[in-house]
């Protein structure tokens, strides 16, 4: 069976107090166990994910760095969105691949970055 999992950006940030990359990586590891269970049961799994909290954190970091030293560039919101997609996809791809390898499952895990149009309003 083909299964599509939709993970909200908040789902990748289990503890609202811990917004660190390490905390989000640990949440991805926990998610990877469930995904690997589905794959081990013979399902084809695709994952889509949000990025709300992560894109906000990245944007705030970029803006703060620019305030400290205006030589640090600002980036348009679509580019910051791509940063967050790459970062989340990287964590999910690696943790799922690691979990599959632990189980002796040789499957490709791939990440696709999308493009979005953000409404000015």
Predicted features and spans:
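N-terminal glycine-/serine-/threonine-rich phosphate-binding loop
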Residues: 1-48, 58-64
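Generic secondary-structure boundary/loop-capping signal
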Residues: 4, 9, 52, 72-76
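General beta-strand structural signal in soluble alpha/beta enzymes
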Residues: 5-7, 47-49, 105-113
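Short, active-site-adjacent cap segments at secondary-structure transitions
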Residues: 11-13, 52-56, 117-120
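N-terminal, well-ordered alpha-helical segments
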Residues: 33-36, 53, 57, 86, ...
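Short glycine-rich or small-residue beta-strand-to-loop segments that form or flank ligand, phosphate
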Residues: 45-54, 78-79
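Ligand-binding beta-strand-loop-alpha-helix segment within the catalytic cores
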Residues: 65-121
């Amino acid at each position: 069976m083909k299964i599509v999992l939709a993970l909200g950006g908040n789902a990748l940030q289990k503890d609202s107090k811990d917004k660190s990359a390490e905390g989000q990586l640990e949440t991805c590891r926990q998610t990877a166990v469930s995904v690997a269970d589905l794959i081990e049961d013979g399902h084809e799994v695709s994952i889509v994910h949000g990025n709300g909290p992560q894109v906000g954190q990245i944007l705030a970091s970029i803006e703060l760095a620019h305030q400290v030293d205006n030589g640090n560039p600002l980036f348009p919101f679509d580019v910051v969105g791509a940063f967050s997609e790459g970062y989340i996809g990287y964590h999910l791809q690696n943790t799922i691949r690691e979990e599959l390898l632990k189980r002796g499952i040789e499957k490709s895990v791939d990440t696709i970055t999308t493009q979005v149009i953000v409404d000015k309003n």
